[in-house]
Amino acid sequence: MQTITLAMSVDDIIGKVQNAVWGWPLIILILAAGVWLTVRTGFVQVRHLGKALKFMVKNEDNGEGEVTSFGALCTALSATIGTGNIVGVATAICLGGPGALLWMLLAAFFGMATKYSEGFLAIKYREKKDDSHYLGGPFYYIEKGMGSKWKWLAKLFAVFGICVGLFGIGTFTQINGIATAVQDFFDPKSAHVAFTLLGNDYTWATVIGGLVVTLCVALVVLGGIQRIAKVSQVIVPFMAITYVVFALVIVLGHITAIPAAVKLICQSAFDPQAALGAATGVTIKLAMQKGIGRGIFSNEAGLGSAPIAAAAAKTKDTVRQGLVTMTGTFIDTIVICTLTGLSIVVTGAQNAFVAGSVEGVKITSRAWQTGLPWNCLLYTSPSPRDTR
């Protein structure tokens, strides 16, 4: 009983911290910064998107750095593709209605200008150490760009960055999504429990899956930024292209449902109770909060993670790297999140879950299981808790 109470207390604390961090003040701050930077850069995400996509695949010949611009981009994308645009989109749609997808795309549009600025500053204020390693990111451009009197803010950012990296979106969210997917595939009824901790049962599928992921991550991370970039350059394009192809199969396979899905998304973005019904409890405020918040979570625009990787890019051109960094938001949210959202809405996967049992990875899995023409080969029978 004490263990269950402790687990509930931990969940309550995490929930309160989450609501505080992803509340309106932070969302408005990051979104307002994106709007301001969009105006200041003259809508760089519109005027130079084509050039940015070209620079993304064409590395600079005589740049200074440790990894290619494409490698730095893939390193940043490896932290966002799979978590925010698969799990996050599904959760946003279930909690905020299909209209959350539209607000997510709006956040991504302005977030592209923020990402451009982050990449620009990463190169402008990076430092080359004696061992030829390049270091940069928010800690450096806060201190060097704003002045030494703001060094305390750079240190504070580093402390919070470590906390988020260890206990937030850096590790826990990813491994939870992977573990849930592995368990639902190999042991959907949780019949083989390895141990119980804080009131939660952990199956052997979860334990073994976690150990495999830990080993793979260790082998990559211990090789430094160069090995991380090399592995990311192979894995990220492969998983992104594969995911896009399968998502397109689902969406195009339900092509007749697309107009109704788009209409539902637009209607529920501005009048969710009229589109979904008053009983759902979804309001325009909730749709905006979940959509914009999950959008920022998905592409990490303004969170300061991408410029750390961008600082190691082989380039002398600040504008060029800013444009390359900007494409991360375009790929992550504008392309992949849109396809994820459409695949969920056209298949109606979000309707199989109630707010109290929302688990994003299961919702997206259901869309794939029921939406793919060969779903019989991929489908695993859901447990009763999956269909509540």
Whereabouts are the PLM-identified features?
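Single conserved hydrophobic/aromatic residue that forms the stacking wall/gate
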Residues: 379-388
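Membrane-interface loop-to-helix entry segments
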Residues: 29-36, 40-53, 175-182, 204-266
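Membrane-interfacial loop-to-helix junctions in multi-pass transporters
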Residues: 22-27, 59-68, 98-99, 147-155, ...
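Extracellular/periplasmic helix-exit of transmembrane alpha-helices
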Residues: 38, 118-126, 130, 246-264, ...
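Alpha-helical membrane segments and immediately flanking helix-loop junctions
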Residues: 63-95, 121-145, 156-159, 163, ...
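Flexible loop linkers connecting adjacent transmembrane helices
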Residues: 43-69, 91-93, 97-101, 113-148, ...
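N-terminal alpha-helical transmembrane segments of multi-pass membrane transport
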Residues: 2-83, 93-100, 111
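Selective recognition of specific alpha-helical transmembrane segments in multi-pass small-molecule
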Residues: 110-118, 210-225, 236-256, 289, ...
